[in-house]
Design a protein with these regions (language model features):
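Conserved, well-structured interaction surfaces
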Residues: 83-155, 188, 205-213
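Alpha-helix C-terminal capping/termination sites
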Residues: 55, 150, 154-157, 235
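Short coil/linker segments at helix-helix boundaries
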Residues: 129-131, 154-195
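Membrane-proximal, proline-rich intrinsically disordered regions
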Residues: 3, 20-69
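Sec-dependent bacterial lipoprotein signal peptides
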Residues: 1-20
Length: 235
């Protein structure tokens, strides 16, 4: 009888250990940050995601709405009212077309900020890997500058670096520079916003200095960064 009791107890302990082991698994549809930033290839996958999100329809319209509000675009008889609220200037606080641009931009910034923080700690085994990692980090800085620039153009008054609105509180945008789901920062000044944009572009220029422009390039190159910087300075 004692032998049967011992066997039962041992079998129960074995099943318990197996059960605990099976429960200790990563989610099948997501990765924790502890395992998502281990290799240069991981960084490449994150970087690919930057470009995928840029194609998001809600944020894409951020580049077209100013045209719809101007005389450069006019609705046809059968346009289906796509962008109609923007075209007719009937924008209200709850207009989803506008809300979604803000929302999608900050989703993109959350990913970019994660990478700007995490990429530098990824180990590299060769000069080639270090070059690749610097390129991906440079693209992350370029993306952050791009998002901030789009947002400040759409949601802030025109900036005059020598004017009276440079240091007025809350005329810029919230400058989220790290990933923090609890952060609720106030808007920065316009001066602070444009200083941050130019700072990020300077980082991108340094890190992408060896990535020459090419016809049909589909990622950030040094030429693209310089073109974006010129656009910012012309504002």
């Amino acid at each position: 009888m004692k032998l049967i009791t011992k066997i039962t107890l041992i079998a129960g302990l074995g099943l318990g250990l197996v059960a605990c082991e099976n429960l200790d698994q990563e989610p099948y549809n997501q990765l924790s940050t502890e395992v998502a930033f281990k290799t240069v290839d991981n960084a490449m996958y994150w970087r690919n995601g930057f470009y995928k999100r840029l194609r998001d329809a809600a944020f894409y319209y951020a580049t077209t709405y100013p045209e719809l509000q101007s005389d450069l675009a006019n609705a046809s008889e059968d346009f289906g009212n796509r962008g109609g609220i923007i075209h007719t200037w009937n924008i209200e606080a709850g207009t989803t077309d506008v809300r979604d641009i803000w929302h999608r931009a900050y989703i993109g910034l959350a990913n970019v900020n994660q990478c700007i923080t995490k990429f530098p700690s990824i180990p590299t085994a060769s000069a080639n890997e270090r070059t690749r990692l610097n390129q991906y980090l440079g693209e992350a800085y370029a993306f952050r500058a791009y998002y901030f620039f789009q947002l400040v153009q759409l949601f802030s008054p025109k900036y005059d670096p020598n004017g009276s609105n440079k240091d007025v509180a809350n005329l810029g945008i919230p400058l989220l520079l790290t990933f923090d789901v609890t952060a609720l920062p106030n808007r920065a000044t316009l001066g602070q916003t444009y200083t941050q944009i130019l700072s990020d572009l300077a980082q991108a220029e340094t890190l992408l200095s060896n990535k020459a422009g090419a016809v049909g390039a589909d990622t950030f190159t040094i030429d693209a960064v310089k073109a974006l910087k010129a656009r910012v300075l012309l504002t």
